[in-house]
Design a protein with these regions (language model features):
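Bacterial N-terminal signal peptides that target proteins for export
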Residues: 1-8
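Bacterial N-terminal signal peptides
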Residues: 8-18
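Sec/Tat signal peptide C-region and signal peptidase I cleavage site
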Residues: 19-23
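N-terminal lobe/hinge region of extracytoplasmic solute-binding protein
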Residues: 30-79, 109, 116, 178-182
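Extracytoplasmic/periplasmic ligand-capture domains
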Residues: 60-63, 88-119, 130-132, 179, ...
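Surface-exposed binding/hinge segments that line
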Residues: 76, 121-165
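A generic structural motif
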Residues: 83-86, 137-143, 196
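Long beta-strand-rich cores associated with HINT superfamily self-processing modules
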Residues: 350, 497-522
Length: 522
């Protein structure tokens, strides 16, 4: 399934030839703006992409999730539950203060406890028992047991400056007062709904970027974003709509860049509460009984989804049907799981077995600005469910509202997406582990599905050092989740970007749009 390509004139090719000399400025148009500049406020791709410009992590993430040295230039396992990290020397924050191990310790203490987070970074610190500063250039992380996924977790956590952030709030980051990192760009200003401005860090340890000034503009509407690209108002856009793909491919002034994504589009259902706020009977009368608690109902909804039709007719073939939560060729995928067939008759039988032969009504929320055709996909799923007697009131909204309200359990069903990092622990821990803010498990489990067998398999995997055994345990956890249909896997997206000719972009599986990946063609 893996693919990473540049497309010119409708064919896959290596980029050859030279483009015109570049201006010093770069303007990127993104589908969704961040919910905050605070790098620990919300596990959310727009926030993570923003953070990577201003801050660095101990471990850097390559385009396909490769683990590379970041602020730590080397590390070693001292014991099964102790990791030692040597920090890169000569690194300074944007205000000139030297980066030290104390900043790492401060960061790891702060990241999981930021107030009002819609999806907490506690999921990435859950294995950490304590942090020990050995000296200014060395830190030890003590874990709660063997922690083979620690490096994956540390890839997600931006290191901030104690002297700039101690005692400061998320609002201080948004205003720029605390947004002082070690990253390749310095924060200049943020006008929510309009633009985010940065300037290159001339002393960046990784080398100075080719762009003196960076502007990131949120343009949620697909047509408006494409129009800005065609008019030359921006240098790059993300999320090329499938309906405009052929037109952009044919334009000699542009280039398209595509790669398979880590993003899983899924449906989460309220499987915990006896009464759910968006549930009514087939006539629309509110009920105090929640049919989504029955696994047969959840399996019926899964069988009612025509994945090939969604992908071919609505997404222009720019997706892959999902039968589990990581791609089937990914380490840790279950060999037993394939995308479910479209079977409306089987779905009706399951509803009848569950004592809902006439169906019911439910409200399903979705984003309308987060991933390609998100609101349209939700509407199409609603129409498919209507054919088995489940009447769906689709309620699209901006992603920031969806996640905030979803975290408050305001919805009975949500169609959403999760972008992992290549490690199966990412979606399994975030979306399906039993919700527990004390342990950092299940921070995005907005349906509160809970299964002891799943938790046991996942928990064992998280502490298993042998890679083969670990991956088998991840597969077992996925088998359990799909059998109970705790979360419905729908499809994996394909990420796409367009740039003006003379630029190249290295597409990323995490779908982040990073100025660091935009380079002049030589």
């Amino acid at each position: 399934m893996a693919r990473n390509s540049v497309l010119l004139g409708g064919i896959f090719t290596a980029w050859l030839g030279a483009g015109p000399a570049l201006a010093a400025d770069l303007t990127m148009a993104v589908r969704t703006e961040p919910s905050s500049i605070d790098p620990h406020f919300h596990v959310y791709v727009p926030n993570g992409a923003t953070a990577k410009h201003v801050f660095d992590a101990l471990i850097s993430a390559g385009p396909r999730g490769e683990q590379m040295p970041g602020l730590s230039d080397r590390w070693k396992v001292v014991a099964d539950d102790v990791w030692e990290f040597h920090l890169r020397q000569g690194v300074r924050f944007h205000d000139g203060v030297t980066f030290t191990a104390d900043d790492v310790a401060f960061t790891l203490a702060r990241a999981p406890v930021v107030p009002n987070s819609p999806s907490s970074y506690s999921q990435y610190t859950k294995q950490i028992a304590s942090v020990e500063v050995i000296n200014p250039e060395t830190i030890r992380i003590h874990t709660k047991g063997p922690a083979p996924g620690l490096l994956w977790d540390l890839m997600q956590i931006s290191i901030i400056a104690r002297h700039a952030a101690d005692g400061r709030s998320t609002a201080d980051f948004n205003a720029g007062r605390a947004a002082i990192g070690t990253g390749p760009y310095r924060f200049v200003s943020w006008q929510p709904g309009d633009r985010l401005r940065m300037t290159a860090n001339p002393e960046y340890w990784g080398g100075v970027e080719p762009w003196a000034n960076l502007t990131i503009r949120p343009i949620a509407n697909d047509g408006a974003r494409v129009a800005a690209m065609l008019a030359g108002d921006v240098d790059m856009i993300e999320g090329v709509p499938s309906s405009d793909r052929a037109r952009l491919l044919a334009d000699p002034k542009l280039a398209l860049w595509e790669t398979d994504a880590f993003r899983i589009i899924y449906i989460v259902m309220d499987s915990a509460r006896d009464a759910s706020p968006g549930i009514a009977d087939a006539a629309g009368k509110p009920m105090d009984k929640n049919p989504l608690r029955d696994a047969r109902v959840r399996r019926a909804i899964n069988l009612a989804i025509n994945r090939p039709a969604l992908i071919d007719r609505l997404l222009g073939g720019q997706a892959h049907a999902a039968g589990q939560y990581v791609p089937s060729d990914n380490p840790g995928a279950s060999p037993n799981l394939k995308p479910s067939p479209y079977d409306p008759d089987g779905a009706k039988r399951l509803l009848a077995e569950a004592s809902w032969p006439d169906g019911f009504s439910v409200t399903m929320a979705s984003s309308n600005d987060r991933f390609p055709q998100d609101a349209q996909v939700a509407q199409a799923v609603g129409q498919m469910l209507a054919r088995i007697g489940v009447k769906v009131n689709v309620t699209p909204m901006p992603a920031s509202q969806l996640f905030s309200r979803g975290s408050k359990l305001e919805f009975s069903m949500m169609l959403s997406g999760w972008v992992g990092n290549g490690d199966p622990a990412s979606p399994l821990t975030a979306l399906m582990a039993t919700y527990d803010p004390k342990t950092g498990m299940g921070p995005s489990n907005r349906g509160r599905w809970s299964n002891a067998g799943f938790d046991a398999a996942l928990g064992e995997a998280l502490q298993t050092l042998d890679e083969g055994k670990r991956n088998a345990l991840f597969g077992r956890a996925a088998d359990i989740a799909v059998a109970d249909m705790g979360v419905i896997p729908v499809y994996f997206t394909i990420n796409s970007w367009a740039t003006r000719k003379g630029l190249k972009y290295e597409g990323r599986g995490d779908e982040m749009s990073l100025a660091m990946g935009v380079k002049p063609v030589k």
